[in-house]
């Protein structure tokens, strides 16, 4: 992957010529004589400085893509905050980007700098199929993720129960199979050297039917599905936020924290943590009056037993919130029906308090889960938007060429620029996760700096 080694390999390949028997089959034009010897390399379209510069830039892009996506895989598999089943989609998507960087980009760079295909006819077909496969799998992954987001928003309880790791893995297998079906045609219809070409070339089928079908299947149809699904998600989320705000009014029920603009309570902030539930309960007027009445009865009973038992009762207890419980415990130690009544009231108070704590805790957990779901949905929307921005220029210009040919053909340098911008997308997803998701950011820091600290200690 290092750029000096890649540049040296390109120079050696240019001096050597096409490999094996394919040189006679593919390169028998003006660049070779009848016997296939004294092969002359094509005139390079880049200077030596440009070759070194491009090799360095693309080499850095390859290394950055591999390292970033490997970090994504490690983070999802090791971080407790990222171990949700739906994050397996991100592992598979990162794997596709790693394969693009290792199996496609180096050969695309060599083909670009050498101005001919050096690696033989068989690998040409495999290379083209892998190129289309990984690009198609990326967008089909994003399409499956958008459907997963939609079902988790519209059928939260039912779908979350069904979304097990096994189901997610089965969906990922289906995504790769669909991508393979779409990318299979290059294996049987890849582009061969046109008549009169002096040097072997490797390109996709140039017929209109293939250009349009591959563009629709690999890009435009999944993009349409993603756009419709995310528009529906936005409408559902907006309607749900409006309904909640109308129900709550200016103040939330039961003293709940006010909501922010995105419908999340302050207790479930950006870091996904809840404020600890309060143990004190603010009862209504009737329950307060009832508790005062019980406290007075217990206090009077305690005074009557004070001389015999030496017990001070609950009159000087720590506070009104705990006086009833302490009085109940004091009375429960005395015999008679009053003790049984006090014991029952103590149990009812404790049950009431524990039930309120459990209710607040469950609400808190639900808010944290909703906050994470919303952040995850937003991050994936950014990922999809960046993917479309990177690949749309290439697919639009490519399909335009398939329709009107030379009349709509872009200048070759611009078309190649669009082509490489699409490859750059494979390196951007880890950056997006780092910028927009705190769980990924924290996990990346943990992976990188914890291991570095261990190395310093050793």
UniProtKB/Swiss-Prot annotation:
Gene3D superfamilies: Rhodopsin 7-helix transmembrane proteins (1.20.1070.10). One of its GO terms (biological process) is G protein-coupled receptor signaling pathway. The chain crosses the membrane at residues 52-76, 89-114, 125-147, 169-191, 208-231, 380-403, 417-437. The record marks 214, 218 as: Implicated in catechol agonist binding and receptor activation. Pfam families: 7tm_1. Its main location: membrane. GO terms for cellular component: axon terminus; cytoplasm; glutamatergic synapse; neuronal cell body; postsynaptic density membrane. Residues 245-343 are annotated as: Disordered. SMART domains: 7TM_GPCR_Srsx. The record marks 131 as: Implicated in ligand binding. It comes from the Eukaryota. It is found in: Cell membrane. Residues 1-51, 115-124, 192-207, 404-416 are extracellular. PROSITE patterns: G_PROTEIN_RECEP_F1_1, G_PROTEIN_RECEP_F1_2. Alpha-2 adrenergic receptors mediate the catecholamine-induced inhibition of adenylate cyclase through the action of G proteins. Belongs to the G-protein coupled receptor 1 family. Adrenergic receptor subfamily. ADRA2C sub-subfamily. This is Alpha-2C adrenergic receptor. The lineage of its organism: Eukaryota, Metazoa, Chordata, Craniata, Vertebrata. The gene is Adra2c.
């Amino acid at each position: 992957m290092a750029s000096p080694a890649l540049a040296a390999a390109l120079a050696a390949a240019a001096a050597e010529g096409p490999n094996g028997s394919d040189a006679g089959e593919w390169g028998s034009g003006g660049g070779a004589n009848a016997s296939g010897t004294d092969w002359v390399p094509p005139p390079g379209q880049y200077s030596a400085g440009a070759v070194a510069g491009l090799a360095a830039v693309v080499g850095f892009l390859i290394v950055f893509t591999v390292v970033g996506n490997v970090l994504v895989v490690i983070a999802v598999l090791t971080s407790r905050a990222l171990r949700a089943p739906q994050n397996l989609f991100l592992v598979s998507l990162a794997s596709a980007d790693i394969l693009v960087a290792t199996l496609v980009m180096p050969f695309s760079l060599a083909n670009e700098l050498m101005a001919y295909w050096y690696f033989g006819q068989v690998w040409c077909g495999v290379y083209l199929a892998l190129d289309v496969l990984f690009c198609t799998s990326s967008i089909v992954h994003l399409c499956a993720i958008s459907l997963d987001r939609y079902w988790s928003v519209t059928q939260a309880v039912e779908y979350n129960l069904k979304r097990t790791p096994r189901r997610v893995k089965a969906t990922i297998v289906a995504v790769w199979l669909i991508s393979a079906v779409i990318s299979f045609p290059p294996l049987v219809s890849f582009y061969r050297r046109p008549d009169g070409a002096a040097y072997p070339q490797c390109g996709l089928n140039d017929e209109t039917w293939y250009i349009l079908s591959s563009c629709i299947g690999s890009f435009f149809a999944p993009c349409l599905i993603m756009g419709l699904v995310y528009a529906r998600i936005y409408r559902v989320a907006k309607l749900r936020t409006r309904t909640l705000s109308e129900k709550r009014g200016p103040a939330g029920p039961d003293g709940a924290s006010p909501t922010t603009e995105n419908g999340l309570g302050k207790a479930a902030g950006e870091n996904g943590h809840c404020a600890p539930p309060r143990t004190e309960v603010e009862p209504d007027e009737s329950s307060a009056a009832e508790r005062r009445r019980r406290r007075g009865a217990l206090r009077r009973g305690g005074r009557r037993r004070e001389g015999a038992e030496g017990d001070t009762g609950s009159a000087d207890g720590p506070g009104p919130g705990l006086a009833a419980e302490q009085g109940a415990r004091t009375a429960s130690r005395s015999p008679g029906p009053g003790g049984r009544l006090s014991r029952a009231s103590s149990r009812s108070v404790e049950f009431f308090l524990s039930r309120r704590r459990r209710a607040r805790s469950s609400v808190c957990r639900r808010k944290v889960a909703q906050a994470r779901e919303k952040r995850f949905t937003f991050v994936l929307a950014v990922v999809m938007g960046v993917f479309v921005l990177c690949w749309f220029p290439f697919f639009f210009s490519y399909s335009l060429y398939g329709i009107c040919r030379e009349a709509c053909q872009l200048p070759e340098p611009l078309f190649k620029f669009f082509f490489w911008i699409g490859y750059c997308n494979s390196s951007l997803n880890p950056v997006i996760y780092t910028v927009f998701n705190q769980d990924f950011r924290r996990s990346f820091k943990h992976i990188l700096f914890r291991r570095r600290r261990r190395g310093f200690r050793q």
